[in-house]
Amino acid sequence: MTDLPDSTRWQLWIVAFGFFMQSLDTTIVNTALPSMAQSLGESPLHMHMVIVSYVLTVAVMLPASGWLADKVGVRNIFFTAIVLFTLGSLFCALSGTLNELLLARALQGVGGAMMVPVGRLTVMKIVPREQYMAAMTFVTLPGQVGPLLGPALGGLLVEYASWHWIFLINIPVGIIGAIATLMLMPNYTMQTRRFDLSGFLLLAVGMAVLTLALDGSKGTGLSPLTIDGLVAVGVVALVLYLLHARNNNRALFSLKLFRTRTFSLGLAGSFAGRIGSGMLPFMTPVFLQIGLGFSPFHAGLMMIPMVLGSMGMKRIVVQVVNRFGYRRVLVATTLGLSLVTLLFMTTALLGWYYVLPFVLFLQGMVNSTRFSSMNTLTLKDLPDNLASSGNSLLSMIMQLSMSIGVTIAGLLLGLFGSQHVSVDSGTTQTVFMYTWLSMAFIIALPAFIFARVPNDTHQNVAISRRKRSAQ
């Protein structure tokens, strides 16, 4: 990348800062949830919605981000994304109630949904094709550093300042990023096809109301009759989308995607798999603080080994999959993650705290292997004309399943615990033990899906080539 013009390198730095802001925010909040609950006068069992409101908004808005960038221009949309994210951060810090915080997090989510995919699109437009991989590696590196710093930084700010600062630190970075975007980034546009607004609205309504209904009457405060109504609305919306997308070449996501077996299995496995693994970043710091009495900073530091394990494993995932094949790797890592989850719970409740960093490092390795394998399995056999649509659908499903996972984790805590959980409660560790056991069971379930993946990797490649040549 040294032969790129200075202006292009500056533009890559802007995209990298956007990736860093978005990735930092996904992890920095987790260690602050108990302190937020105390400050806002809420039960810690309700604080999972702080994460859900952000991740669910990202899932809902993702399908529109690429079309908006092509229509309005990458500079305009990237600038808007940074402004919305920064304003959302300010409103989060100013929130005095949980409902205000949830609305502010949703605004953050709108910005976050546009920031990363539009950033990728920007790199694609400003960098020569032969240097695209090197450029993407450069801009995504800060996105890997964000999760590494987030938990510890969040714990440090909460312990020595207040939870408001985990949002306030975004403001100066956002202002600098917005100004730099206007000054340095070109406003590339492309000819766009008509946006499938009907399909977008049907999917958005279906995802939002079903996730809200899943939280139950205790979590939302809604009556059982209203919850039943939300479920009915969500199911009807999704069925209407399927009818809308059938034989519709302009559908948001073509149903032709599901003719590729590995895509169908990979997407189903990714959805189910990320529901389980999506619980872990939320539950781990909450358990360490409320269940074991760790300080916010100590709990944040304990999350670093998990991120290091994840980053370290990415270098050898390809060799592992090539050696053992997708089916064996995915089944083994799914069951392995369930066992590691049980191991974490056992060592924590036994008081073997010195073992926890090693267990969390192992958890990060297993989880990273499974994530990378799921992603490549899902997309590897798609024909070229469906690859972009399939990637967008996978990105949306990833965010949606994580929001559902956090919702289920909060629901399990509510089922097993009292309305208010404190460190002094004699039942607290029992509540968390039952929750972790349930999580381990949920994490193991996708193994049944992955067991149906064709076993031989080379055979899969040969089949995919015949499919591509036949279309």
Curated annotation (Swiss-Prot):
Cytoplasmic side: 33-48, 98-101, 159-164, 218-224, 284-285, 363-395, 452-471
GO cellular component term of the entry, any: plasma membrane
A molecular function GO annotation: transmembrane transporter activity
Pfam families: MFS_1
Subcellular location: Cell inner membrane
Disulfide bonds: none
Membrane topology: Multi-pass membrane protein
TM annotation in the entry: 12-32, 49-69, 77-97, 102-124, 138-158, 165-185, 197-217, 225-245, 263-283, 286-306, 342-362, 396-416, 431-451
Record CDD domains: MFS_LmrB_MDR_like (cd17503)
Alphabetically ordered keywords of this record: Cell inner membrane, Cell membrane, Membrane, Transmembrane, Transmembrane helix, Transport
Periplasmic compartment segments: 1-11, 70-76, 125-137, 186-196, 246-262, 307-341, 417-430
Alphabetized HAMAP family for the sequence: MFS_MdtD (MF_01577)
Family per record: Belongs to the major facilitator superfamily. TCR/Tet family.
Protein name as it appears in the record: Putative multidrug resistance protein MdtD
